[in-house]
């Protein structure tokens, strides 16, 4: 990416009591992000993650991220869902992490790596337009969902994994889908095993040149979220595998800003997989709880 402009470093104020956090969003998928130089993943048990992610009594978020500098040009991204469960990977969290790691001067602007539990993710840091691009590990193309029968208005169901498992459901009209109900039923379908899966519903618009529409029921949040990065990648690969869309393909979620997927698709695997989308810092604050000695 030529012409990148590094965001200005965030000024450091006086010492604070508690944990300094950054609230970020990727297409409406929101996160609390912490600097791992000031805290450690070991201090964030499930109950504490749930507390800070609670939308009524905490900061409110779909997930928690801790960024920790590792080897040169590498940042460790630890991720938890809002229910306190650990997540191997989150695409929108990676986009947000790519921006904040540069702002916190963990790495210089340009290209660097995020180390996740789903593998190494290359990041192209964004300019001032609040966007970033991530290069994901090669993945198998989504396949027909095992023993999952499409309901009325559904064309097909595919199952894939982009760091975490994803169902992709092609529907006639995404606005008529009861995402909380249908998503919850598919997420815990016995055919998927005890871990279940995220569920993504996709439909085209009347203008086939317009972005595809996508809505997601997220495992670990156990609700519909405004966007899902890895789910968007799974959807793009499923559509490409069925030749319903060419790559790159762009999606619009309920969160607003678009996400674009590009990849090289072979007979059974996708290579050079990229996701481009928003990574925006909303505000920062201080979280005080019993762990901080309040």
Predicted regions and their residues:
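Internal active-site segments that recognize and position negatively charged phosphoryl groups
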Residues: 149-178
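Active-site glycine-rich loop that binds ribose-phosphate moieties when present
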Residues: 138-157, 184
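Short glycine-rich anion-binding loops that position phosphate/pyrophosphate groups of nucleotides
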Residues: 27, 139, 165
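A glycine-rich beta-to-alpha transition motif near the start of alpha/beta enzyme domains, typified by
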Residues: 2-128, 168-294
């Amino acid at each position: 990416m030529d012409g990148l402009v590094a965001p200005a470093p965030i000024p450091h104020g006086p010492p604070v009591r508690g944990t300094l956090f950054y609230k970020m969003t990727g297409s409406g998928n929101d996160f609390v992000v912490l600097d791992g130089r000031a805290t450690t993943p070991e201090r964030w048990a499930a109950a504490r993650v749930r507390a800070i992610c609670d939308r009524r009594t905490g900061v409110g978020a779909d997930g928690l991220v801790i960024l920790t500098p590792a080897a040169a040009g590498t940042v460790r991204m630890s991720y938890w869902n809002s229910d306190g469960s650990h997540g191997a990977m989150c695409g929108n969290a990676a986009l947000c992490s790519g921006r904040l790691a540069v702002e916190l001067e963990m790495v210089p602007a340009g290209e660097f790596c995020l180390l996740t539990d789903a593998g190494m993710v290359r990041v192209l840091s964004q300019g001032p337009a609040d966007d970033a691009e991530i290069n994901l590990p090669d993945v198998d193309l989504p396949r027909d969902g095992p023993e999952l029968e499409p309901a009325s208005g559904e064309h097909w169901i595919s199952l894939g994994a982009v760091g975490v498992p994803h169902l992709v459901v092609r529907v006639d009209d995404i606005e008529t889908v009861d995402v909380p109900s249908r998503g919850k039923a598919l997420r815990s379908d016995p055919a998927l095993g005890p871990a279940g899966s995220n569920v993504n519903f996709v439909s085209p618009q009347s203008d086939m040149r317009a972005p595809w529409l996508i809505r997601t029921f997220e495992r670990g949040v156990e609700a519909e979220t405004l966007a899902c990065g890895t789910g968007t990648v799974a959807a793009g690969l499923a559509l490409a595998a069925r030749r319903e869309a060419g790559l790159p393909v762009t999606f619009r979620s309920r969160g607003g800003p678009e996400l674009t997927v590009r990849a090289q698709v072979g007979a059974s695997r996708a290579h050079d997989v990229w996701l481009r989308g928003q990574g925006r810092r909303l505000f920062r604050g201080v979280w005080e709880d019993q762990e901080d000695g309040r």
